[in-house]
């Protein structure tokens, strides 16, 4: 890497959104100069000029100092980033790339900055048909939705699910939920989208939902460990009490892909759905995609999917100065679709 004269990260005006734990146990966060040390860039790292970064629920947690996500201090959040290679890793300067996971925004500085440095093995060439902002509108949310729907297809379709069976997506107004609605509908399933936001009805219907319901409309007040089976497959982005209730209503041989915890991290349930109906509860972790080839294949699928959903998919462009406010709104359940940070 070059000396610090003109070095990416030390350029005048290069900024980031950084969070740190204060001595009194509080959290201090905001926009500040990125200020890299050139010696800190390892030989196997790639430096990327960030053009856009996806805003995920994990980023909202990191931005507010949640210890389960913010593993180091100080930290630049942003588990997704897209931009162009500046140097390193044997990649040509100017190559359009995307990167997700690999500790970004958790154990190492992430994409809410003008530049990011990442392990070369984490970098994926951006599909030519997917713009930088479209890539981040998809991001980890899109990858997670694809993995979840693939897992459900293996578990549920293998038992010859009927075409008229209903598939549920909870938290359908969020990025993962909306993507899951689109993926399941494209596979020919009858999708029921669950959201407490009235404003989401038109959007998720446009993405392929056959029906839109509120959480209270699918919760059965009966204090039983099992209720009438309704769902063949479920993509759950909420967790907590809603996931526990949904499990009781999964049909025999059905499955639930668990993704999020916006509704709570605790799961109070019984073993009855699993041992009496053969229900599978599968955890989904998009950060655990093992190889570059598998990640690249998923990105190619997102590039094919995006043109079919772009017109209906809500995307909000955010400046670095907007990060704190958007994080608070996301944690309060007040956002819809995807936010993308443009760190220019």
Each language-model region and where it sits:
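Mid-domain Rossmann-like dinucleotide-binding core that forms the NAD(H)/NADP(H) cofactor-binding site
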Residues: 136-215
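Short amphipathic alpha-helix with an adjacent loop that forms part of the alpha/beta core around
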Residues: 218-229
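N-terminal Rossmann-like NAD(P) cofactor-binding module of classical short-chain dehydrogenase/reductase
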Residues: 98, 232-235, 257
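Glycine-rich phosphate-binding loop and adjacent beta-alpha segment
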Residues: 107, 241-308, 342-344
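Glycine-rich beta-strand-centered segment in the early N-terminal region that forms part
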Residues: 38-55, 66-104
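C-terminal hydrophobic helical "lid"/dimerization subdomain
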Residues: 4-5, 9-12, 293-344
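A short N-terminal beta-strand-loop micro-motif at the entrance of redox/enzyme domains
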Residues: 2-7, 15-51, 72-76
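NAD(P)H dinucleotide-binding glycine-rich loop of Rossmann-like/cofactor-binding domains
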Residues: 99-167
């Amino acid at each position: 890497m070059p000396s610090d004269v003109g070095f990416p990260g030390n350029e005048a005006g290069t900024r980031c959104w950084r969070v740190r734990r204060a001595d009194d146990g509080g959290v201090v966060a905001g926009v500040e100069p990125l200020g890299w040390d050139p010696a800190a860039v390892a030989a196997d790292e790639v430096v990327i000029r960030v053009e856009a970064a996806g805003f995920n629920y994990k980023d909202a947690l990191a931005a507010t100092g949640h210890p389960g996500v913010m593993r180091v201090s100080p930290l630049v959040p942003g588990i997704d980033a897209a931009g162009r290679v500046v140097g390193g890793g044997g990649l040509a300067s100017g190559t359009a790339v995307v990167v997700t996971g690999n500790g970004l925004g958790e154990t190492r500085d992430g994409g809410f900055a003008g530049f990011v440095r990442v392990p070369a093995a984490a970098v994926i060439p951006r599909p030519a048909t997917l713009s930088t902002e479209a890539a981040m509108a998809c991001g980890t949310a899109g990858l997670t939705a694809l993995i979840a729907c693939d897992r459900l297809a293996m578990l549920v379709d293998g038992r010859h699910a009927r075409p008229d069976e209903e598939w549920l997506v909870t938290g359908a107004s969020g990025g993962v939920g909306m993507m899951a609605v689109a993926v399941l509908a494209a596979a020919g399933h009858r999708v029921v989208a669950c959201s407490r936001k009235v404003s989401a009805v038109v959007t998720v219907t446009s993405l392929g939902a056959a029906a839109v319901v509120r959480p209270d409309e699918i919760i059965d007040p009966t204090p039983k460990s099992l209720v009438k089976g309704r769902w063949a497959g479920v993509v759950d982005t909420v967790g907590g009490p809603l996931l526990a209730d949904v499990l009781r209503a999964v049909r025999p041989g059905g499955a639930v892909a668990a993704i999020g915890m916006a509704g709570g991290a605790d799961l109070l349930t019984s073993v009855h759905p699993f041992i009496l109906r053969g229900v599978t509860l599968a955890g989904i972790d998009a950060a655990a995609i093992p190889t570059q080839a598998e990640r690249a294949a998923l990105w190619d699928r997102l590039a094919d999917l995006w043109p079919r959903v772009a017109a209906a998919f809500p995307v909000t462009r955010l400046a670095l100065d907007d990060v704190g406010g958007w994080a608070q709104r996301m944690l309060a359940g007040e956002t819809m679709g995807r936010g993308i940070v443009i760190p220019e």
